[in-house]
Amino acid sequence: MLTNLGSLHAIAACRGDGLRPELARLLRGGANAFPTPGETKMSREQENKALVGRWFEGFWGNPWNPQIIDELAAPDMLLQYSLHAPRRGRRDVRSFMLDFRAAFPDLKFWGAADLIAEGDYVVGRWEGGGIHTGPAFSDFLVGSLPPASGRKMHFTGTTVLRVENRMIAEEVGLDDGVTALTQLGILKAA
């Protein structure tokens, strides 16, 4: 059972080291993989956690996998975090991440605790960040960065994802945006 996002890098390589066969197959074969005869079918919560684990690793990890958007994001997916305006749909989500990663080429987030699942919802705690070495970035709700500011951000958050028809329908996160914006020099500490 997938329990810790911190080990996703090894899992994503799909070596199957110590993984239950159905989880290794799910990670290799995507959300439509099914157990072979004799294997126990994963619960909906287990499937949803595995799907969210693949999403976190592919979308927020480094290197990122742009194809993960077409593979796992619902066509009208909602992506919403306190630092940025809400994004809706695959094209908008892709555009957001392309701009974010151009500005922060080393951007990476990883799991800080076990995933929790209930029904269609999966909750994950994470941490991460990056150094702004790319073009000017103005996607924050307040302020912007000039080109290659060299400023570093490292912060944490908690995200609630809703899975619908084996796709990520919503990703809504609460992050420590004040810390990130202060580190980037956009907000001034009191």
Residue ranges of each PLM-predicted region?
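Residues at the start of alpha-helices and the adjacent loop-to-helix junctions
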Residues: L2-N4, R44
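Generic early N-terminus positional signal peaking at residue ~5-7
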Residues: G6-S7, E47
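C-terminal and inter-domain tail/linker signature
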Residues: C14, L23-L26, N32-A190
